[in-house]
């Protein structure tokens, strides 16, 4: 048991060093930075002019929907590549499990299409 856990010691040391360096990089600017706020430093600056309007714009919900659909189908491709590489070793169970996965995604895509979620009218 100790031999098994002993092989993880370098990984634990690496994670510990990474955490210490990350926290040091997060805390260092607050400890070292010179703070002298004035009206010009606190004002909004945009291309040499004061801001004309509020920088926050309302986005249509369809942009978020398209981005979520992109992420879903991008993950589908990420699952398809390892499946295609190890297709011969997995046999029929791997084939049919991927077909079920693709069927669920296809049904979801058809549902989104029929509901009109992809229409931009």
From Swiss-Prot:
Pfam families: Oxidored_q4 (PF00507). NDH-1 shuttles electrons from NADH, via FMN and iron-sulfur (Fe-S) centers, to quinones in the respiratory chain. The immediate electron acceptor for the enzyme in this species is believed to be ubiquinone. Couples the redox reaction to proton translocation (for every two electrons transferred, four hydrogen ions are translocated across the cytoplasmic membrane), and thus conserves the redox energy in a proton gradient. GO terms for cellular component: NADH dehydrogenase complex; plasma membrane. NDH-1 is composed of 14 different subunits. Subunits NuoA, H, J, K, L, M, N constitute the membrane sector of the complex. Its EC number is 7.1.1.-. The chain crosses the membrane at residues 11-31, 65-85, 90-110. The keyword Metal-binding does not apply. It catalyses: a quinone + NADH + 5 H(+)(in) = a quinol + NAD(+) + 4 H(+)(out). Belongs to the complex I subunit 3 family. The lineage of its organism: Bacteria, Pseudomonadati, Pseudomonadota, Alphaproteobacteria, Hyphomicrobiales. This is NADH-quinone oxidoreductase subunit A 1. InterPro entries: NAD(P)H_OxRDtase_bac/plastid, NADH_UbQ/plastoQ_OxRdtase_su3, NDAH_ubi_oxred_su3_sf. It comes from the Bacteria. Keywords: Cell inner membrane, Cell membrane, Membrane, NAD, Quinone, Translocase, Transmembrane, Transmembrane helix, Transport, Ubiquinone. It is found in: Cell inner membrane. Its main location: membrane. The keyword Metal-binding does not apply. One of its GO terms (molecular function) is quinone binding. It is a multi-pass membrane protein. It comes from Rhizobium meliloti (strain 1021). The gene is nuoA1.
